[in-house]
Amino acid sequence: MALAFGLSACAIHPASDPSAFAARTSQNSFELFGAAVDPPETLLLPLVHDPQEDGAACGAHALASLINYWHGAGTVRGADIFAASPPADTVIGYSMAELLALADASGLLASAVRIPAAGVIGELEAGRPVLVPVKVPSVYVQSRQLPGMNVPVLGLPAEIVTSRTAWLSEKTNWSMLNHFVLVAGYEGDKFVVLEPVAGFRTISAQRFERYRAPFGDAAIVFSRK
């Protein structure tokens, strides 16, 4: 994750909660086209983004959003989890086993499973966000973006560059990063994920499947003890 946090350009403006995301669903996505969802028609759980501050801390921040979902807003910060219980490997970040232990210590029932997209949808419909490991192009999870990314008209060329860079990363397996995201909702053939760097983002089911494939559809499902 360190590579992604070393890039520089204009600051990103994350969609930190469902209402902020609803105002501009097409502007925060892994997709170049067809990114928008219609929030009144979208199943979207009321999670709140806990912004990632360290390159190895995505698991801690994703877990913080989950804990705050189950136990109440402001219960914990990912930065505090990371400071108190850093991953054994501070370059790669948290393992699923470490996150399971942290979830248990935080009063959540957590189980590691292999679950296809249909199963993820079932969890969402039961009101349970799902934590999944993904392998993504680093350009998609950097904390800074290309100039003009958030400006109408100027944003499209920057997004095209980002999309092309991501495509090359996938094809060459260069600058691909292991990352954790929370699946927070879905609509049709798109999922909404809460990504620790940029907040709520849409992603096509096809892309989501590709990014999950290196981990064999692994996931962690949660409920309150």
Could you describe each region identified by the protein language model?
Residues 1-8:
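Bacterial N-terminal signal peptides
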Residues 8, 110-111, 219:
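Generic structural motif
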Residues 10-96, 117, 136, 144, ...:
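Active-site-adjacent structural segments surrounding the nucleophilic cysteine of cysteine proteases
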Residues 11-18, 24-34, 125, 140, ...:
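Noncatalytic regulatory segments and standalone regulatory/sensor domains
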Residues 65-73, 84, 88, 102-109, ...:
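Structured segments of extracytoplasmic/periplasmic soluble domains
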Residues 75-76, 129, 192:
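Secondary-structure boundary/capping residues
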Residues 102-142:
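...with weaker cross-activation on analogous glycine-rich loops/strands in unrelated enzymes
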